[in-house]
């Protein structure tokens, strides 16, 4: 190869931690390249080394760290084509050092050998000062890429590069998504050096009146109190597993996919009610009840050895990616109509023509009004539809006459149901033409009836009158009062 870069770790901050060989590499280099001045060893190195090139000025040039690291790598590769390069970084070269990753990834392309000479990681000193054993479970993350979704709160958590107040504030807000505001965290600065500082603070004070620099990390002890983990999906999953386990609940253990069907339907309708009420707290509760049903079915599947919740999540994740090529691939769309058209085409391809009828994809268990709307919509896509709404109204009138004719003769229960069903089906066509969801429309009317009849009940109770003793005219008067009250409000 055309040149060589030797990467040296400066350790946690004490010159005594360096081996004789590494000390010689640092002090004998014609030019020592150092990522940053912010390290306890720099003052001593400046006394012993002929020429040091720091890269702190590169940080000032760029708004993004990625650009900083790329430029440092470019400079080092260029220098290595002229002479052997020694590059020093804090701690260990392979611990939280993006520039070292870039050097090793690009060495073949640049035709430059990259050799790592080692160095003590600050993690060793941090484990020592905190007196923790990483074998118990340990997570190490960069403050700049911290995500609440990726945190494993049952393990020791160390967040590095909490170098200023803004970064500390972002870390605090991210942790507050998962932890109580007063949860105790530990701020560790310059672990293993003479300037080592340790401070325990409640989480809400993480960015208040604390000294922070490039050598600062934050330690979050593992959560021991189970209720603090109730927001975690894994905790909920373990609760359901225990409910159906050997020492679990007799009722939960007895349930099957069939026995739970009614509860799924009930919970979904209760969720719809909460949505209609625009009641956020009620929605949270009902979404939880629906999720409970999903987890119960998944746990039954796991207990029987057929599938787990992981299979469920994997399946829907794959489906969402597959059916959104305009998001996850390079497919271009103009609007939501293109999206829906793509969705149907992809869905059809997934079915692999296994359905013998266009209508086979409409679930048989849908509520009747919703099913009617879906059946009509499917048929309309291939041209089986009315062109003008006046034709639909004519069909409604025709079905009304047929029903009236059936009633006027000696009515047969089956025929009455069939003719009345035809009226409803025709009215669903009207709703579809005007883009009305018939199930929602009827739900609104049901709710309206409930409100107005409740007004009649309450008024009668206030007046000390039994409903059974009221005339239809009296109740109709109260009904109109309720209607007028609603109109004014």
Swiss-Prot record:
GO annotation terms (biological process): dATP catabolic process; dGTP catabolic process; dTTP catabolic process; dUTP catabolic process; TTP catabolic process; UTP catabolic process
GO terms assigned for molecular function: methyltransferase activity; nucleoside triphosphate diphosphatase activity
Matching Pfam families: MazG (PF03819), TP_methylase (PF00590)
Protein known as: Uncharacterized protein YabN
């Amino acid at each position: 190869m055309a040149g060589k870069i030797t990467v040296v770790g400066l350790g946690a901050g004490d010159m005594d931690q360096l081996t004789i060989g590494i000390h010689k590499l640092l002090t004998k280099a014609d030019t020592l390249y150092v990522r940053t001045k912010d390290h306890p060893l720099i003052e001593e190195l400046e006394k012993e080394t002929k020429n040091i090139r720091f890269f702190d000025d590169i940080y000032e040039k760029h708004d993004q760290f990625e650009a900083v690291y790329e430029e440092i790598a470019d400079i080092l590769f260029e220098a290595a084509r002229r002479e052997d390069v020694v590059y020093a970084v804090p701690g260990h070269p392979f611990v939280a050092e993006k520039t070292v990753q870039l050097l090793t990834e690009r060495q073949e392309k640049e035709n430059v050998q990259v050799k790592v000479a080692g160095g003590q990681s600050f993690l060793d000193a941090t484990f020592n000062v905190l007196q923790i054993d990483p074998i118990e479970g340990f997570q190490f993350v960069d403050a700049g890429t911290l995500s609440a979704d990726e945190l494993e709160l049952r393990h020791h958590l160390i967040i590095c590069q909490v170098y200023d107040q803004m970064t500390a504030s972002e870390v605090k807000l991210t942790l507050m998504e998962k932890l109580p505001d007063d949860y105790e965290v530990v701020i560790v600065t310059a672990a293993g050096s003479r300037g080592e500082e340790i401070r325990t603070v409640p989480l809400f004070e993480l960015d208040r009146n604390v000294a922070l620099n490039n050598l600062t990390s934050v330690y979050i002890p593992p959560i021991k109190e189970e209720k603090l983990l109730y927001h975690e999906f894994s905790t909920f999953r373990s609760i359901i597993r225990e409910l159906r386990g050997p020492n679990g609940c007799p009722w939960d253990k007895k349930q099957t996919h069939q026995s739970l069907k009614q509860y799924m339907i009930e919970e979904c309708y209760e969720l719809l009610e909460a949505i209609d009420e625009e009641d956020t707290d009620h929605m949270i509760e009902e979404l939880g009840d629906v999720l409970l049903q999903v987890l119960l079915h998944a746990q039954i599947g796991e207990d029987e050895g057929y599938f787990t919740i992981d299979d469920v999540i994997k399946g829907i994740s794959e489906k969402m990616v597959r059916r959104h090529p305009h998001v996850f691939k390079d497919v271009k769309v103009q609007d939501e109509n293109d999206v829906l058209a793509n969705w149907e085409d992809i869905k059809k391809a997934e079915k692999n023509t296994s359905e013998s009828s266009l209508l086979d994809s409409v679930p048989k268990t849908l509520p009747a009004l919703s099913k009617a709307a879906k059946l009509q919509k499917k048929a309309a896509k291939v041209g089986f539809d009315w062109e003008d709404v006046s034709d639909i109204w004519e069909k409604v009138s025709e079905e009304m006459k047929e029903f009236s004719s059936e009633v006027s003769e000696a009515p047969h229960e089956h025929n009455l149901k069939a003719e009345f069903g035809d009226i409803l089906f025709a009215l669903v066509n009207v709703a579809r033409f005007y883009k009305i969801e018939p199930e929602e429309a009827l739900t609104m009317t049901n709710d309206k009836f409930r409100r107005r009849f409740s007004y009649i009940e309450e008024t009668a109770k206030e007046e000390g009158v039994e409903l059974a003793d009221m005339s239809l005219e009296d109740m109709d008067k109260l009904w109109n009062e309720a209607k007028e009250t609603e109109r004014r409000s």
